[in-house]
Amino acid sequence: MTEEVGQKLLESLSLFKLGDIGYARIECELLTTFLEEQLENNLDSLSIHELSTNLIRNRICCREFIESRPAKKWVFLIFRLARTLFRDKTRIATFHSVNLHSEFVQVFWRNLTYQTKSYRNCKFQTFQFIASRFLRSEHDWNVTVVNCLNVTQKLIDNGENARKFVDCNLEDAVLVLLATRQMTVLQHSLEILGRLSDWSTTCRENLCESNTIDVCLQLIPDGDILTQKLCISLLRILSCEEQAREQIRIYDGVPTLLGLLSIKNSRLQWHVAWTLAQLAEQHETSLEIAQLGGISLIFAAISNPKPPGKAVGDWVAMLTGLTALLAQLAQASSNQQLMSNANGVYILGKLLAIKKNVTTDETIDSWDLLQCSIFRVLRLMYTFERSRQLLKKVLPTEIFEKFVDVGNYNSVLTDYDQIAKMYDNLIEENIEIMKDWETVNERRQAVGEVGEYELLDQLGAGAFGCVYTVRKKAQSHSENPAKLLALKEIFMTNLNDRESDKSFGDMISEVKIIKQQLRHPNIVRYRRIFVENHRLYIVMDLIQGCSLRDLIITMKEKKGNFEEKKIWAMVVQMMLALRYLHKEKQIVHRDLKPNNIMMTTDERVVITDFGLAKQKGPEYLKSAAGTIIYSCPEIVQNLPYGEKADIWSFGCCIYEMCQLQPVFHSTNMLTLAMQIVEAKYDPLNEMWSDDLRFLITSCLAPDPSARPDILKVSGMCGVRLLEYLDDVARQQASTSDMTASQSSYNIKIDESPSSLNSSTSSYKRPGRSSKTSGSGKLPPINPAPRRNHSMSAGETPRPSSIVCLPRITDKYSVMFPSAPSAIPSRRRVQTCSTEHPARSSSSTELKVSKQSDGLTVSSNVLRQIQDPVLTILNQIHRILVVTDKETISTSMNHQRRLVEMFRKNLLGRENDAVQMKTHLRKLAAESPEEIQMNLGFSDFRPVLVQSHINGYQKDQKVTKITYEQLSACIECLIAENPAAK
């Protein structure tokens, strides 16, 4: 019986009888019996091979079979048999040996794109039975399509076979299925696209030109774990292409990806990490990831990691991916600082011995790769001065030498292999070496107390004292963490009690001047001064940033140069600080150098270390102070000097920013002094502007009388100063507008639900229009304001005219039967004639004429009343027309995506009816107000360019879009789509 069924099925598949219903019914019965009883196990290999060949040639790759429009059950059984047979790789090889890939795609996939565009008008309907019918009736055809996709997925088993399918444009057809709501179909489609793009550059390029990235980013927030993994995996593969990375950035994909880092799933986190690592190759995206808190999220994921019970290999790969992302972020010096502030050195160091905490039977070859990746991040962080000090404390000498020899900004992972093996051997010999990392833990308990402050970490030390990071002792009633401050400790030794007290008094008086007077954003703020245990303590703001010296060293190690715009931004801020010190406070800093100029994380310049500052008196200062290579000729020659000493140091700092080396440098002190006195230095490179050259030359004038003061310096930089202030004003205006818009958006609108006219007039169009409601624009609701002229003797009144109101019909009584008294009597109202004396000088008298049949008025003086409900419905109709699913296009269209995101937000759960009405009325009025929604764009410039809209800065990001611009996009989409018209 078994052999008989198999033989009959083999014979049935060897031929095809067009239009024979009985033949189709018999084959369906044979297929059902064969599958349910699993008869393929009873056939010999030759019969199975023949069965597979007939199935391929005469069914799934046969155009005549498909054009006969077989029944759904028949197609389902055919693909179920194919799915069963293709579990064996030899039968998959049989399919590829037949070489009918093109026929398979054409028969089952090619016409899918035509069917989804307009399957009713398509003459060639070979896929209507499986594709177009599925899109129209997903539930009925779901299982059939899943089997078809599963078979296709099995056939894409290597790169060569994947490229054969790509040559037949299989990805274009599968892409359309991403519009389905059936999760199984969606996941199989994503898997197929991932396999094709992973093995084919052509496929990646084709998908980048489609809306694939947009679809994936929209599926991620609401999808399950498997869907999220498939979407992120596809994005990771496509991110090899620059076009894909640009699309992800434009579609605001970076925040979406960062939000997935906190999900405890190793494979998902691995995909996210490598996707972000590729995006972070662009400097701006790297900074954006850091600004969005990405560095903190990464360290939270790798600090105190707990190995899973199974799939440890995936877990190790995830840690490697996250450290690779950190390595890419560490290419930016500002990110190095954030990583150091996040206790990154300690967290990464403890991760080096994670292998000792894992017990597993799995053979994991990626431990060495993880250690190499960790050392690469630490080496990139080493270029930051703070991290350099910490790493010197913990790395053994023999390893530290190899560590330094790798070189700065070396991202080649294999160069760290020897270091990783050496350190791993040290751990094997003595696990106690890992305790050394506790000394660089900046989150440990306070190391001591001084007064009301807890000492957290030592920032630096010198001959006269130390500088600590401190915080106020926690208050029992306070839940907020204490603000971090800097505490400067000054030793007072070798003094008797009387001298010590006097010195304390003198020093406190000197610093009190600074504390009480200096209030400037570019100058460090001193908070408190106190004495304890024969030591002077100065509390000041902790500058979260790095010094100009660190920036110069980092840039020199990168073998690059600062952008001139950035140099001017720092120069202007330093000028503002010096003007404040010299002209308002009469203070000379006397030790202005790159080490004392800090750059915060938001690129604000802060001048610090006023230990040598002096307040100017009537006489010139005479004491020697400062670092000699930044000292002016007057100080070197021990001559009186004034505020222009700071101008000289200012010029030295600017020169060093440009050339990345001090303006005067020599190992011989006498030679160095001669260079300073004679102002002999190497000229600037030709790459710098004439303005910068002239500024440095003027500041480094050896004759103090020829050297300008800070006001003249500002005059030399007038144009640059105005450009900087213009940028600051623009940023403040943008921030202010955004805050104001957000505040107004959050205010609850108090209005009656039944009143549609009450708030219509509160949104005015920029201009008048004579278009009717069909245009989607609102006319002004309130009539023109009327003026009541007084009838005083001093005015010549104008002759009045009779005002006739339209007759009020009985419709009023029908609409409001409960209020008959509100119906006015029909009469003619006439204004008082001005030919008679007025009874009042401040009012207009109305005179009632005899009762007549009704009131009449000319129709041409009436203003047409427009139903606001129709206006709102018109906007809804326009939005639905351009986002109609029957007009699905797989091509990338920024405008359509914008409208779809607006519709999604408008109809979301967070919007109530009042907010929906407000948004639609603003859209109808083409309001210039910005839309306060997350529309999924980090930059709207591609949308505006595609819509040919002007009026924005083309060289700056456009992070918000107005209702007026959205309306223009909708009009463009309607104009481009004949069906929408």
From Swiss-Prot:
Pfam families: Pkinase. InterPro entries: ARM-like (IPR011989), ARM-type_fold (IPR016024), Armadillo (IPR000225), Kinase-like_dom_sf (IPR011009), NEK_Ser/Thr_kinase (IPR050660), Prot_kinase_dom (IPR000719), Protein_kinase_ATP_BS (IPR017441), Ser/Thr_kinase_AS (IPR008271). GO terms for biological process: regulation of cell cycle G2/M phase transition. Residues 735-746, 830-847 have a biased composition (Polar residues). The active site is at D591. Residues 735-802, 823-847 are annotated as: Disordered. Its cofactor is Mg(2+). Residues 752-762 have a biased composition (Low complexity). The keyword Transferase applies. Transmembrane segments: none annotated. SUPFAM superfamilies: ARM repeat, Protein kinase-like (PK-like). Its EC number is 2.7.11.1. GO terms for molecular function: ATP binding; metal ion binding; protein serine kinase activity; protein serine/threonine kinase activity. It is an enzyme of class 2 (transferase). It catalyses: L-seryl-[protein] + ATP = O-phospho-L-seryl-[protein] + ADP + H(+); L-threonyl-[protein] + ATP = O-phospho-L-threonyl-[protein] + ADP + H(+). ATP binds at L459, G460, A461, G462, A463, F464, G465, C466, V467, K488. Residues 453-725 form the Protein kinase domain. Keywords: ATP-binding, Kinase, Magnesium, Metal-binding, Nucleotide-binding, Serine/threonine-protein kinase, Transferase. It comes from the Eukaryota. PROSITE patterns: PROTEIN_KINASE_ATP, PROTEIN_KINASE_DOM, PROTEIN_KINASE_ST. Belongs to the protein kinase superfamily. NEK Ser/Thr protein kinase family. NIMA subfamily. This is Serine/threonine-protein kinase D1044.8.
